[in-house]
Amino acid sequence: MNSAKVHEHASAGKDEKTREDTARIYARFAATFRSDTLPPAVARLTKQCILDTIGTTLAATTLAPEAPLFHDYVRDMGGKADCTLIGYGEKAPVQMAAFLNGCNSHMLDYDDLGSGHVSVATVPVALAVAEKCGGVSGSELLAAVAVGIDIHTRMYPYSTNEEWDINQRFSQTQCLGYFSGAAVAGRVARLPEDKLVNALGLAYQQVSGAHQRHLGMHAGWCGQGAVLATMLAQRGVPGVKDILDGRNGFFNVYMRNLTPDYERLTGELGKRFYTLEHHGFKAWPACGLNRRPISSILQLREEHGLKAQDIERIDVSGGQHILRLAEPLDARRRPTHSAQAKYSIPFTIAVAMVYGDVKLHNYTEAGMKDEAVLQLADRVWVHLDENPTREKEAALVQVRTRDGKVYQSQVKYPLGDDRRNPMSQTQIENKFRDCASFSKKPIAKAEIEQIIELIGNLDKLADVRKLTTLL
């Protein structure tokens, strides 16, 4: 790459002079998109995003070790309690609700995938602002989340041409979440186009987030920032200009290569939703890189009737990304913290082989002491493929039985992998039921079913507060 060409899109070329400001285009899209024109497939996927995000938020209230600390902080801050703290049976100011719910939604690393973690940056914001404003219909909430996710997906670097790539020192979820969150909040708060431009500008001034996993705070920070930007813009506070395209805009400050793909960024807004092309859900509550090894071991278990006690050893080979989930090996085989367990190939595929699934309870304190799992994890070995390519993210899993038989599998598209192997509606609902069972505020089975039904018919809901009262 010619470093001299970096940021050349900021120069005042002919196209630059005639191209409309991208932030204004997004603001207009968010402010004026008609909810009754949302394509059915997008509406269906957005409902799944909302259900899935609420579920992971509920589960974190008791399963995430750090959740009580965040909850205590929010309670201690006080303020006007008008927005639901999901899973607690309490309320807090809108900004604090967006923060805590955002953190919890992302804290278990069980939230959806695709163009970054888009739902945790948008759904908690939408619910908090809708409750704050009141009178927000389900169809409006649905449209707001769909618009925000689409903006986030369009801006997500890896879904554009290969020459446009975000500097990996920054979190895509958090950095882009300020913009998508502000678009969602502004839409729900009914801001006109000009004020939404200001909200995006105020959001940009807060953009941050090192690419280091930290207790779900990527989603909490951008959610809180998006609400703050929207509330200030609503009151008439101006935001900075040229926030995406300008010399000091996001593309120049946070991107490192050549011209952004403007056709992808703004083409066919409201008609083509990239969410449909770049979105998936996690079938298992583990690090995303564990999904392929899990799928492979489950496939071998089912096809050959394998049982843990019959296995002599399991070998997993892949690129450097796979090796990171196995070092140091002794600690990964016997994790002492849920995050360590989720990011462990030996422990996680041992769970999958022993039980034929991987569930939330497998990462609890009791689950990490499961002797059957630990004994098998001691027989799991992970190897570096000396010639790794991106395709080899599909790790090769080989099982050797005690009678000398060898079986292997290399699943490329695990369950939940966007369009290629999507989770069914029933699978997503069952995941929600499992998550909801861990809520700090107990939710009766009948209420869990009511939540599923309300979200499934969200476009018919007169006021979103009918949903939030159940959370």
Predicted segments with their positions:
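Hydrophobic face of alpha-helices
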Residues: 43, 47, 51, 122, ...
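Terminal-appendage/accessory-domain detector
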Residues: 1-115, 217-224, 231-471
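Glycine-rich, mobile lid/loop segments that gate access to catalytic sites or pores
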Residues: 131-228, 242-247
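Function-dense linear segments that define catalytic or interfacial modules
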Residues: 91, 96-155
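Generic structural signal for well-ordered, non-membrane alpha-helices
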Residues: 24, 28, 52, 124, ...
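Well-ordered alpha-helical segments within folded domains of soluble proteins
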Residues: 119-128, 177-182, 223-228, 290-292, ...
